[in-house]
Amino acid sequence: MKTKILFLLLMTGFSIQVFPQNTVSRVTDSNTALHLLQPDYPVPYGPAKTEDIIAVLDRIYTFLDISTPAGIIDRQTKTEITNMSKLTAGSVFEPGIFRLISYEWGVAYGAMLLAGEATGDPKFKEYTLKRMNLIGVVAQYFKTAPVTGQQPNSPVRSVLDPRALDDAGSMCAAMIKTLNSGGKPALRSYIDNYIDYISKKQFRLQDGTLARNRPLPNTLWLDDLYMSVPALAQMGNLTGDNKYFDDAVKQVLQFSQRMFNKNQGLYMHGWVEDMNVHPEFYWARCNGWALLTMTELLDVLPEDHPGRSEVLELLRSHIRGIANLQSGNGLWHQLLNRNDSYLETSATAIFTYCIAHSINKGWIDATANGPMAVLGWNAVQTKVNSKGEVEGTCVGTGMSFDPSFYYNRPVNVAAAHGYGPVIMAGAEMIKLLKNYQVVINDAAVMFYPLGTDWSKYR
């Protein structure tokens, strides 16, 4: 009988709701501390562990040590040359995924030195010393045959005959850092050659601002700050000659007068003298180069230099502008103020390094800026794959005055621009974690001075 009634009810459209005997209570404000629910973060949240950072750096090191062999071969026979007295005009560097001489690898050499300092592991420093000293030996051979050495297919043409700031600045700064870290004295002659190009041969505007005639006459590329100023600053530190510091400061201030938007706290990528209106495209990596330039300059600029306070205030203003635009997953966008442009790794790594370094130096407040650096690193480390490759890095990029150009630049793990910055960011985060208590308080990352009983602030 019961079965028939149930059948009739179903046939006539009635539905029966069945309730379980043990009903689970619904989460409400009255029965749950909702603020303690665990968020679904897109990247790890909270302070990184030093051992985890070192593991990331080790992975990158292993990949790069294999990908950039420190060897010489005969161009024709491909035979390895182990006796440097047997070099010939046909000697070239053993091929790898990345070139040993490039502005990107100048960053990587300096980054390896920083990683060695932060971790205490000598392999990072040895990476740079081995390759830089090899470059010096090969350059010395080709220097004795200048016609051969300056030909386009010479492995050291850009060392002996630099023709652009891209050739000179980053490698020069890295060579000086290497020299100060135990590199062979023979590097000094190539340092002098690079500096001579930057100081005397590179095209400048009438007021002395470093410029290019590409893609238009009298054009400033923000990237060129990094391709010149760190080398000038390091040379000032090496020689004690203030003329290098003066030129370095002049470049930062005169670029900034033309290219820094004080309201946005950001730099435009390009500036052309003959334009009546200057389109402002805030490309992420060029802003990274500018911030890294000021960071490296302040590292060695004498405290009593008359331009120091102005450079320091520019750095602080720039960091404030960048801070406003970090995405929710810790990365910054390819065009910083356009959230529909893709998220980019190399710029994020540079920003993370510079912010962490500025905190460690006492230039900016740890409480306000530290969580941003932690989030930046947590995002960056997710872009280092199991092979040690850095993903999500924009390839080399020219200048444009339309957004589509920047939106559609490819990314590639072979883009050399990402490796040095990621190593730098990791190394500086290790130092940051040693200098502050970084904890989770009330579910958020907080920075406290060492020795603080932060539990009383819960």
Description of each model-found segment:
Residues 215-216, 337-339:
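Short, solvent-exposed loop/turn elements at beta->coil junctions and helix N-caps
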Residues 112-115:
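Alpha-helical support elements that line or immediately flank enzyme active sites
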Residues 222-334, 341-352, 364-398, 402, ...:
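Extended ligand-binding clefts on enzyme/binding-domain cores
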Residues 125-126, 136-270, 387:
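Extended ligand-binding groove/face enriched in aromatic
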Residues 22-103, 118, 122-125, 130, ...:
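CBM-like carbohydrate-recognition segments
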Residues 1-23:
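Bacterial Sec-dependent N-terminal signal peptides
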Residues 45-48, 214-215, 277-278:
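Active-site mouth of glycoside hydrolases
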